[in-house]
Amino acid sequence: MPQIKLLDNLTINKIAAGEVVEGPYSIVKELIENAIDAGGTAITLEIKEGGKKYIRVTDNGIGISSDDVNRAFMRHSTSKISSLQDLSTTFSLGFRGEALASISAVSQVEMITKPKDQSYGILTEIEGGEITNQKKVGCPTGTTMIIKNVFFNTPPRYKFMKSTQAETARISEMISRLALSSPHIAFKYINNQTTIFTTPGDGTLSSVILSVFEKNFFQNLIPLSVNKPALELDGFISQVDFVRGNRSFQIFYVNGRYIKSKLISQAIEEAYKGKIPINKYPICVLNIKIDPEDADINVHPSKTEIKFHKEKEIYHYIYNYVTQVLSESSTISEIMMIPSTKNQHQQHHHLKEINLSQENIQSKESIGVKQQDKVMVADEQEKVKEYNSQYVMDSRPKVQPPPMVNTLKTEDTQLNVASIISNELPVESRGIRTNPQLQKNFIKTYLQNYKVVGQLFNTYIVIEKDQSVYLIDQHAAHEKLLYIQFHEELKKETVASQQLLTPVVLEFSHEDYITLIENISEFIPLGFELEAFGQNSIIIRAVPLLLDKPKDYNFIFELIDQVKNEKHVKPDYIREKIIQRSCKEAIKAMDILDIQEIQQLIRDLEKLEPPLTCPHGRPILLTLTKNQIEKLFKRIQ
C-alpha cells in the first residue's frame, strides 16, 4: 500500500489554482473584482489571443503598499475580511485571498502598484508561484496586473483550454457583466489592440447598456425600480416581443455582485408566462439589494452562485414587481413601436387591410418575398448608426417556382357546387377515414379520369371517381408540396437566397459577434450571405427564402442562441422554419379555385408518397364511398 505523503507547496498551489482559475475568463473576473474592490473609478482590460497569452488589468484604485506586496500573493491573505463573522456583512466582491496566489501559480505575472501616499511604485514579477524580480519603479497611483502564458506549467490544463474565439467570447461576456454591475466606473475593453467598448462611468445603468450592447437591445427594454424595506430592485426587463433562445441575457446582481440564480430566473419567467412563446426567455438586467446577512455568497469558489435565506419572499417580491411592470408597460410598448413617419404607419396598416383574395394572388404568383415587404436596414455608410425602411428585392431569376404555383391564378370564376351534398354529415360518421395503402393506390393509379365536383366551403376540393368521393384539403396539399420543395433545396445545399436591395448592417454584443464569426460556416448553407463589417457588426447581403420575408432579424439571434446551446444549428429548428414558410406560402382555406387550378394541384399531388399528411400531421385526403353514403341515408343496411 502506498505511503501517505505531504505534498509540497508548489503542488498544493497548482492543485488549488484549479478551483479558482478555470481559464482566462476566471482570471479576468478575479482581477477586475479586485480592481473594483480597490475603489477604482477607471478600469482597463486588455487581452490578446483570448487571454491565453496576455491579460492586462489596470485600475486607478488605492494600490498596494510596498509592505503588503509579497503578502498579496500568499494564500488566504486578504484585506477584506478578518473573521468568519465578516462574511455575513461584507459588500466586497473578493474575500478569500486566493486569487493572486492561484493565478501566479499557473502563469507568468507582473504587478505594478503604488498607493497614493507612496512616492514610488513596486514592480513584482512571479513565474509559477515564485518571485523572480522585484524593484521600485515610477508609476501612477493604482495597480496594473499583467498575466502571460496561462497554464504554461500545467500542460493538461493548457490542453483543455477552449479555442481563442471561445475564450474571447467568455471574457467578453464576463467584462460586460462586470461593467454593468458598476455604472459609476469607466471601463475600457481592448481585444487584440482593438477597443471593443468603453463606458462613461456616469453612474447610470442605461449608459453602460448602450455602450456594451447593440442599440436595439436598449430600445426594447423596460425600466424597473422598486424600493422596499426588505428589498431594492432596479434595472431593466425586456418587452414581451424581445426574447432570446436561452438565459444568457438574464443578468442578475445581488448587492453589486454578478450572480446566477435559478430562483430569480424562475420568478421572472413565471411573470412572463403566457406572454412570450414557449422555449423563449426574457432578457433582463437587474440589481437586487438586500441585507448581506440574508444571502450566502460563499457557496462556490467562483462566487457566482448564491443562496437566499428567505427564498419564498425573494421569489414573490420579484414575481409581483415584474408582473406589475409588464402590465403597466403594455400600452407604452405599443406606442414606442409606432414608426416615426406618419406615412409609414398608415402604409403599414393599409398593407394589413389588403383583402384575402389579393393576398392570395400574390402568394401564388411568387414563392418568396414580395417587393412590397419592408425590412429595417442600416445605411452602409453610417454602419449601424440609424435604421431606415428599404425595399427587399427578390433577385432569383434562375430559381423557378413549382409549376402549380405559376398556373394557380385566382380568378373571379367560382364553380357551381350545388350538386355537393347539402346536408351535414354526422360527426360520428365512420365512413370518412385515412388509409396509407388507399392513398398510395389513389395517388399512383386512381388520380386519372376523375371528375371534379367543385369546392366545399371554398376549403376542400371534392372529386368523384368510380364509386367514391374524395375530399382534398387544398391548404394542406399545397403546404406539403411546398414543404418538400424547400426541404429538398436544403438537403442539396441549394437553398434559394433573396438579395437585399440595401444590405443590412447588424450590431451585436461582442460575445454574440464572436460566436457568429466562429460559427459562420453554420449560416452559409442556409442561404445567408454575410461577412464581418467593422467592430461587432456584420453586413447581410442576402437571406434565405427559407426563413420567409425579413420583417426583422430576430432569427439571426435565435440561430446564435442555437449555436451557443447546441454547438450547431438544430435540424428541428430548420424544419420548423420550413413548415412556417410552407404554411404562409400555401393556398389558404377560403381561396376560390377554378377548375384549372384544381386540376394542377391534383397533378402535383401525384408526386407525393404516403402518408398523405401536411407537415403538421393533418390528413390531406379523405374518402367517402357510395356505399357509406347510402348507409347514411338508410338506403341500405
Swiss-Prot record:
Q: Which biological process annotations from GO are given for this protein?
A: mismatch repair
Q: Which InterPro entries does the UniProt record give?
A: DNA_mismatch_repair_CS, DNA_mismatch_repair_MutL, DNA_mismatch_S5_2-like, HATPase_C_sf, MutL/Mlh/PMS, MutL/Mlh/Pms-like, MutL_C, MutL_C_dimsub
* Protein species of origin: Alkaliphilus metalliredigens (strain QYMF)
Role, per record: This protein is involved in the repair of mismatches in DNA. It is required for dam-dependent methyl-directed DNA mismatch repair. May act as a 'molecular matchmaker', a protein that promotes the formation of a stable complex between two or more DNA-binding proteins in an ATP-dependent manner without itself being part of a final effector complex.
- Print the keywords alphabetically: DNA damage, DNA repair
Please state which protein family the record places this protein in. Belongs to the DNA mismatch repair MutL/HexB family.
Q: Name one GO molecular function term.
A: ATP hydrolysis activity
Query: Could you tell me what this protein is called?
Result: DNA mismatch repair protein MutL
